[in-house]
Amino acid sequence: MIKLAKPNISEAAIKKVGEVLRSGNLIQGEYVQQFEQDLAEYLGVKNVIVVSSGTAALHLSLLALGVGPGDEVIVPAFSFPATANVVEAVGATTVFVD
């Protein structure tokens, strides 16, 4: 496997993840709502929706932009497969570049 980056995870983050896991609310609930509020404030925007994966985020982004059949989306040739898969999922054409 080619490592693209070394994770830098603080002890505070590890502790918070433990709290969330023990709460049983992994998908919705107070932690997700608080994170969305904090992120919206940090970004200076009104609304934020967090999703479960980068794949879901890419998919929603393309849908929000109205990308679909007849569109071409340029993606890097060296990337996670989802980068191209979501383009195909919305009916657009993937164009690989390097």
Residue ranges and their predicted role:
Residues 1-64, 68-69, 89-90:
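Conserved PLP-binding active-site segment in aminotransferase class I/II-type PLP enzymes
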Residues 63-98:
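PLP-dependent aminotransferase-like
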